[in-house]
Amino acid sequence: MVEVMGISARSITVSTVGIVPGIRRLAEEPWPVSLAVSLHAADDELRSTLVPINKRYPLVELEAAAAEYFHKKRRRLSIEWTMMDGVNDTSEQAVKLAAIATRLRAHVNLIALNPTPLTRETASSESRIKAFARELGQRGVNVTVRDTRGRDIDAACGQLRVLAGKRGLTA
């Protein structure tokens, strides 16, 4: 498929919420793709409320699969972290996230939550996101604060799923 599309596999990142068997299967494939894990919380209690699949594949299993992927592929891992005010933008979460990112040698991408009619949470403030990024950086974690794009047309990360649901599509 990659050859047909004219895209180098090295330019492709596969993103997952943490389906452990899928990560392990991808590690066995010959393609040198990068892996991004949508983590959003650094402990099982909070992550299970934000990412329900965590109840099936808890952090210890997810981290083991991600480490296996890194060791087999030698491709950079990314951790995706949607910043939610008062939910996962605390110093406690930053410390826990830094420990996970360090063990996995992962790069962390922070992005403000995009509002949808289905979300109760609100985005962290720009100053809180920057402070969280500083906390990670001070612990030796490579971190990027991502720009939110497409929010004005309901096409940003997380918003398309809601739009697809309104149209009867599955995401």
For each predicted feature, which ranges?
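Conserved AdoMet/S-adenosylmethionine-binding subsite of the radical SAM
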Residues: M1-R139, V143
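Radical SAM enzyme core and accessory elements
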Residues: Q138, T148-A171
